[in-house]
Design a protein with these regions (language model features):
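Phosphate-handling active-site elements
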Residues: 150-153
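Short, structured beta-strand/loop micro-motifs enriched in basic residues and often containing a Trp
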Residues: 139-146, 159-163
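Catalytic-core "active-site belt" of small-molecule-metabolizing enzymes
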Residues: 1-134, 143, 148
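Conserved metal-binding segment of the jelly-roll/cupin
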Residues: 155-173
């Protein structure tokens, strides 16, 4: 099921011209996940309407999360994942694009296609609908869950939210 954890300044990397060299030092069993990120310009409301969620986003960017697992052979429960900060290791964010510059973005996101390559060989592919039917609905889910959990602070303007992997997580070296 869906889970979330914190991304820290020290684990957030902005790719320059969509390129980044990232150290895997200190990460345990790292894997790569292609994702979509949003930067919030204001606090999104509790809604399942993708257009309303998008109105509160400043920009969108493709991203790569490097996840890690402290459990042998990635064998764990959901509770283990949550205790391991949702497996977060690094978040590499590509070039941000202002959401208003992409016509029909909310409707197009479920159909967004991504291919994951390793040494010029495609090892996986996915679509935006793989994350709760749309990256925007994934963001809406997070808003809803945080609102229902009074001990969790709500999302804030300026925060960057990654919406979940579009493919399986694959080992990276």
């Amino acid at each position: 099921g869906p889970m979330w954890g914190a991304v820290y300044d020290r684990t957030l990397i902005f790719a320059q011209n969509n390129h980044a060299v990232v150290s895997l030092a200190g990460l345990v069993q790292p894997r790569i996940e292609p994702e979509i990120c949003f930067k919030l310009k204001s606090v999104p409301p509790r809604t399942r309407n993708p257009l309303e969620i998008l109105e509160h986003s400043e920009w969108i960017a493709h991203s790569v999360e490097i996840v890690q697992c402290h459990h042998p052979e990635w064998k764990m429960t959901l509770a283990d994942c949550v205790a391991d900060n949702a497996l977060h290791g690094r978040l590499i964010v590509g070039t941000p694009v202002a959401v208003e510059k992409i016509a029909g973005l909310a409707a197009a996101l479920p159909f967004l296609k991504i291919s994951l390559f390793k040494n010029q060989v495609r090892i996986d592919h996915g679509v935006g609908a793989n994350v709760l039917d749309s990256p925007l609905l994934s963001l809406a889910f997070l808003v809803e869950i945080l609102a229902a959990q009074k001990e969790s602070p709500p999302l804030q303007a300026g925060e960057i939210v990654s919406t979940g992997t579009l493919t399986d997580a694959h080992p990276v070296q």
